[in-house]
């Protein structure tokens, strides 16, 4: 899994990764953020919260890294 779309979106919105942890509407833990930074999977509910808060779709923030399949 690749979250490169999310990282790019955060840059475009002038936000840091820690904003995902600090934002009460998203409310992810620092360990979840670490998992995402390593390209590990997280729950759909987390992705949904991120999309709702950043006003985007799943495809904007996550993609399949076919080189790792």
Regions found by a protein language model. Give the residues of each.
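A short, Lys/Arg-rich alpha-helix, primarily the initiator
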Residues: 1-18
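Short alpha-helical DNA-recognition segment
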Residues: 14-34
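The alpha-helix within a helix-turn-helix
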Residues: 10, 21-23, 51
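Residues that mark the N-terminal boundary/hinge immediately upstream of a DNA-recognition element
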Residues: 16, 43-46, 57
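Residue-level recognition of specific faces of alpha-helices
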Residues: 32-35, 46, 60
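Residue-level detection of the helix-turn-helix DNA-binding "recognition helix"
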Residues: 11, 25, 37-38, 66
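Short, charged recognition helix plus adjacent turn
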Residues: 8-9, 62-69
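Short, basic-rich loop-to-helix N-cap that marks the start of a DNA-contacting helix
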Residues: 39-52
């Amino acid at each position: 899994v690749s979250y490169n779309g999310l990282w790019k979106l955060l840059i475009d919105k002038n936000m840091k990764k820690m904003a995902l942890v600090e934002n009460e509407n998203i409310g992810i833990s620092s360990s979840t953020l670490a998992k995402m930074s390593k390209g590990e999977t997280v729950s759909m509910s987390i992705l949904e919260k991120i999309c709702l808060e950043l006003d985007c779709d799943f495809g904007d923030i996550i993609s399949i890294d076919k080189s790792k399949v």
